[in-house]
Amino acid sequence: MKVLISIVAFYVVVFPSLSQKKADYKPDWKSLSKHTEVPEWIRDAKFGIYCHWGVYSVPAYNNEHYIQHMHNDAEYGKLGTYKRHIALYGPLSSFGYHDFIPMFKGEKFNADEWADLFVKGGAKFAGPVAEHHDGFAMWESKVTPFNAKDMGPKRDIVGELEVAIRKRGMKFFTSLHHELNYTNVKVKQGWAAADPKYAKLYGSTMKHSEWQKMWLDKCIEVVDKYHPDIIYHDAWLEQVDQDKLRTYLAHYFNEAEKRNQEVIVTSKDEDIPNTVGMEDHENSNPEKIIEKPFLCDYSIGTGFSFSWGYTEGMQIRTEKEIIHKLIEVVSKNGQLLLNLSPRADGTFPEDQKEVVTKIGRWLWTFGESIYETRPFTIFGESTSEGHQVYYTQKGKNIYAIFLNWPGGNIDKSTNDVKVNLKELNSQSIKGKVKSIQLLGLKSIEPVPFEINTKEMSFTIPKKTRTPSEIAQVFRITLE
């Protein structure tokens, strides 16, 4: 009997999975809410990169919603896509969006080069848009003939990137935006798009029930083929039959359980309850720290012709602007997802690569203030000296991240510079401060400081040179 008990105990200790029943998710919100909506891995990862790349990269005009704008003869749009399309390509009766597919060759696409760029940029999770509103799947699909393996590049883009990204130790991300496909373009008779053979591309000419099934089948196919660690969904999930949405989520979570995989699903406007998924804030973040960790997706594109997909002559954000957004987002309990915009041939413009490389360079030096951190009791403050500072913490360290250099000009200053932080004081800091150090210098020397119940102040010696033109980090270590 003792031998039998010992054997059972051995299996319980050594193989705990045998003694613990796996979750079996049902397609209802109560059951789905048992899922851990925000696992610790993404709270540690903090920074990811994804890419809007698809058929819309061929016309490369206005933005990634080209399929919608080209069909809108009442378009008041700032760039007149409809009239331009007619002038360049001909009437909609003879040239449809589907005619761009053979032009979408991706002849220079290299998944390893993409993944190397993501690593160089400091990303901890990464991946492609699997399908945008236009109905063209970027993976090898049996659900729709309009996919990148059978048409266009003739390659499984999602699959190649999954392999390259995981090989480099990153979590695999992908996004699905096809919930808008059915209402995105209301196809009219007389358009080339009205040909029944294009129904699964444009969506709106399908029976609604058939389209709903296709939406679900695409989601299931992506889950089963690529097992993403995180699937991002755009807005408009209310357009999807809720039974099908819950069926998909239950399948995703159950498949993850089989693989001992901690997965995440995101949505906007709580289209998926925040007890089930992670909330995404597009190009924005809360004004203060919020309890639920969130995702902020942020595009490198900016300016008048704001676009997530590549457009000719597009303006992009600087590395400073992106890093400042990352710092703010992290200080408020968020994670930043940066979008890049590759060309139709599968290459990244040099200016985008340069920005990503500079982001990675900053994170290489100051990343300890970002990765694996959690918010401090307050996200930051504007000092009386006019400095914007954000706070994060990890272990026994608190990080004060300044968006501009609080010290003096080394070529002009004759005095030391004193910095006062009202939100850091002996009441807000739980513990005794041991030291303060300015990161990024070859020789990291302790910074003189004082602390009382009202503020912390520290002195930057006049000969101290700023270690970064982007943002400076002071590490405050507790005993």
How would you name each of these model-derived features?
Residues 1-22:
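Bacterial Sec-dependent N-terminal signal peptides
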Residues 20-479:
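Mature catalytic domains of secreted/periplasmic carbohydrate-active enzymes
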